[in-house]
Amino acid sequence: MTTKLIKVTDTTLRDAHQSLFATRFNNSTISKLAPLLDKVGYDVLEVWGGATFDSCIRYLNEDPWDRLKMVRRLAPNTNLSMLIRGANLVGYRHYSEEIINEFVSVSADFGIDIFRLFDALNDPGNLETASKAIKNKNKHLQLTMCYSTGESGKLETKSTEIYTLDYYVNLAKTFVKMGADSLCIKDMAGLLSPYDAYMLITELKNNISIPIQLHNHYTSGLASMTQLKAIEAGVDGVDTCISTVAQKTSQPAIEPLLKTFISNNSTYKININFDQITKIEQTLEEEVKKYTSYSINTKFSNIDSGVLTHQIPGGMISNLTSQLNQNNNLNKLPQVLDEIPKVRKDLGMPPLVTPISQMVGAQAVSNVITKKYENISEQV
């Protein structure tokens, strides 16, 4: 029986704590986890980019470049990846070609092997400069499509909708022409359902030949089932994290997936050291106690079915909740969540991913706290 090896990217050092703890893991915590994760056998560790750069400077009084150098030193055996917001890099505005080129160059020199590159509007034009810079450094270019849906909440096949099957297939073909080494499907809000994933990945596999990676969030409770159907459809890799920082608005845990493929009847395998994961769980259990104040749970449920309506990505929910709490407006969170899809529709149904999600979220908060559209941000 032929078995297929599924490649696994671990997000514990980046998106997991961004989603659950407002990106507050400091260098002390990172330094304890990096060498342990390096011994697991992961194909990739996602360690940088996204909100980590901003959080280091704004909240932690740490140098983000020092963090990258430290992780590279402590995890020499595993590929390191980072998330870049296209022309926005790790910021919230467009940067010049010179800055983009230099940022990519230094990031590569400091240890990044794989650049996961996306644009909040899925606009390939906003990815061109960074893509060329990454290829010039002979690094792996993983171009990324932000998965979103219309009001129906499902992957559409009708041409009257924006986010159709053809939309994603054509975007993938464009990415291949741009020199992508692999494609990432970024399901930042956990909207991709299992059978929609099967349909999407099957169609992508029929049209492109580069590897496909699935990055999804557990927010709606669909993620683990979606990963399994994606694997059955031919996806080449998935993103997971250690169970201590998994689920809720984070990624699915690696442990159940690993157990699933240990079965003698499985046609898939993952080269992961389970005993090493157990050691990391123990370390993480102690470390996360430092960050509980940033994890504000407004309900007991482990999932949020409401995300299928408001479509807020995992990383944004933790920050939005934290900000409302700091301003003594946490009781208005349900109203803000109701307002977000209305603002999104008013703005033309863009994907809710950084920095668009922050713009829509901030406007929704303003609409709830003050008169609707009485205050409109410059970005909107």
Regions from the PLM with identified roles:
Residues 1-116, 120-380:
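Catalytic cores and adjacent flexible loops of soluble metabolic enzymes
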